[in-house]
Amino acid sequence: MKTANKQTKLHVRKNDTVVVIAGNDKGKTGKVLKAYPQACRVIVEGVNIRKRHVRPSQSHPQGAIIEREFPIHASNVKKG
């Protein structure tokens, strides 16, 4: 049986300014950096920041702990 690949449409796009309406970052505003329509998630600048450990490389010879944005569900943001 084949499953339908339904294309989902998000109410926000890249570079839109949005306000977080639910979750730990409620009330914060930021620009949408990337949208994932299939997963119904967006990455918002300065929102949902987590720390990631990075292995040693040429850019980080000793390794590092980097803070970066992670996706949040699109239903938790509104244009604003």
From Swiss-Prot:
CDD domains: KOW_RPL26. Keywords: Ribonucleoprotein, Ribosomal protein, RNA-binding, rRNA-binding. It comes from the Bacteria. Pfam families: KOW, ribosomal_L24. GO terms for biological process: translation. One of its GO terms (cellular component) is ribonucleoprotein complex. InterPro entries: KOW, Rib_uL2_dom2, Ribosomal_uL24, Ribosomal_uL24_CS, Ribosomal_uL24_KOW, Translation_prot_SH3-like_sf. Gene3D superfamilies: 2.30.30.30. Coiled coil: none annotated. Part of the 50S ribosomal subunit. Belongs to the universal ribosomal protein uL24 family. This is Large ribosomal subunit protein uL24. The lineage of its organism: Bacteria, Pseudomonadati, Chlorobiota, Chlorobiia, Chlorobiales. The gene is rplX.
